[in-house]
Amino acid sequence: MMKKYIKSITVLLVILFSVSSVSAATLTQRLADGHKLRLGFGTAVPWAYAGDNGEALGFVNMIALTVLEEMGITEHETKVFEWSGLIPGINADRSDMITGGMYILKSRCENINFSDPIGVFGDAMLVPKGNPKGINNYADVIRTGATLVTGTGFNTVEAAKKFGVPDSQMLLVEGEVGILAAMKAGRADAAVQTFFGAKEHEEKTGGAFEVTDPKLMPKETVNVVGIGFRKSDNEFREAFNAALAKV
């Protein structure tokens, strides 16, 4: 009986050690061992989103896949998260790359590393057609006492606070879907998001909402976008950057 017990414990320890070893391996090592690369992103049209069959769509995913192909990597899996779960997800080993169209911010660099920039983008306000309250930037939100909606974990949360929008005027929801739902329901007077995200909502609603001129936003709201990696995967990140420079 004791021998059987010891054997069971030994098998369990071997399994646990194997799992922890896989988790501790770098992305470069994993791919060499035959594991598929896992792309992590949210639902943020046109940046990154999953198609009907789970395929990675959106222009940031297309850039990432083109670079990976340059590296000789043609197989991957998709992992869809809420935006606020992207960084916790990659650090919990649930994905290998963040391809959601994430701005490179100091606060994010404390938890992950980024590729070289893939583009420069700005934010804008989404408002009801005709912009009845005249909201074009954070100062207008404060001046009018408007309720401003944005996504949990979005760069715009930090930006709104930086420019003085009080918590009492902020509504935080999950992702792009939550933002549009809040605007449709009249729970907010304006939404702040990336210009491309706002344009997508404008088009999706048939003109019920409009996008303000991003040039009326503070210049500090223009940011660069990169692909996110675990800090332990710097070797792979450097190889990705080298391939990015070629495409």
Task: Give residue ranges: language-model regions.
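Ligand-binding cleft/hinge of the Venus flytrap
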Residues: 50-52, 64-74, 138-139, 154-174, ...
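Small-molecule pocket liners
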Residues: 37, 45, 120-125, 131, ...
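A ligand-binding cleft/hinge motif common to bilobed small-molecule-binding domains
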Residues: 85, 101-110, 158-162, 189-221
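Extracytoplasmic small-molecule ligand-binding "clamshell" domains
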Residues: 25-101, 110
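Short loop->beta-strand "edge-of-pocket" segments that line small-molecule binding or catalytic clefts
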Residues: 35-43, 57, 138-153
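Periplasmic-binding protein-like
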Residues: 120-124, 195, 203-244
